[in-house]
Regions:
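Sec-dependent N-terminal signal peptides
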Residues: 4-13
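Well-ordered alpha-helical scaffold segments within catalytic/enzyme domains
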Residues: 39-44, 78, 113-118
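Sec/Tat signal peptide C-region and signal peptidase I cleavage site
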Residues: 14-20
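Residues within well-ordered alpha-helical secondary structure of globular protein domains
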Residues: 10, 46, 69-72, 109, ...
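Short, contiguous alpha-helical
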Residues: 30-34, 38-41, 49-92, 131-174
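Acidic/histidine-rich alpha-helical segments that form the ligand environment
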Residues: 95-130, 137-149
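Short, low-complexity N-terminal intrinsically disordered segments enriched in polar/charged residues
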Residues: 20-30
Length: 174
């Protein structure tokens, strides 16, 4: 009987060990960043161009404005940690860059900038003190703010997508 139970446990456990680890928290910051970056880009690419100008109400950011807000915030928050803002980044781009290809290009560029900058920091760098607006923070805290901000607006964009009839690509696989 014990032998049968052991064989059954081994047979059942084999598929668990054969699976790739899920992307995200099990891979730390870099895994989470890859995950939210992929979702943001996949959702932007799945959204028809005519939905980029959609907004849920007057005075609320449009779809393109939310994506550009994420991109510009990524560059700004990253600049607090040391890297320079892109020279071609101009004030007001959140409202002036509205075409799907341009928005996605800026989004990808900002996501890659965060990924590359984070890959180059050392544990000691993460402890370094920085100043943002009127308060002190650490580089590690800034990276946390960047990923939290991206996820916050991912939720907003999922709501926008569903309100305009777009299903997030990852939800279609379930």
């Amino acid at each position: 009987m014990r032998k049968a139970i052991l064989v059954l446990l081994l047979v059942c456990a084999r598929p668990v060990f054969g699976q790739a680890p899920p992307e995200g928290i099990w891979q730390g910051y870099d895994g989470e960043w890859r995950h939210v970056s992929k979702q943001l880009v996949d959702l932007a690419e799945a959204t028809p161009e005519d939905k980029f100008s959609w907004r849920p109400a007057p005075g609320v950011r449009s779809t393109s404005e939310v994506y550009m807000h994420i991109a510009l915030a990524n560059f700004y928050l990253l600049s607090v940690t040391g890297p320079k803002m892109p020279a071609d980044l101009k004030e007001g781009m959140e409202k002036t860059v509205t075409s799907k290809p341009e928005v996605i290009a800026w989004l990808k560029r900002s996501l890659d900038a965060v990924k590359e900058a984070h890959a180059s920091v050392t544990p000691k760098d993460l402890e370094r003190k920085v100043r943002i607006e009127d308060r002190d923070a650490t580089v590690d805290g800034m990276y946390l703010r960047i990923i939290v901000h991206a996820n916050e607006h991912m939720g907003q964009l999922v709501a926008y997508a569903r309100m305009t009839g777009v299903a997030p690509p990852w939800s279609k696989k379930e």
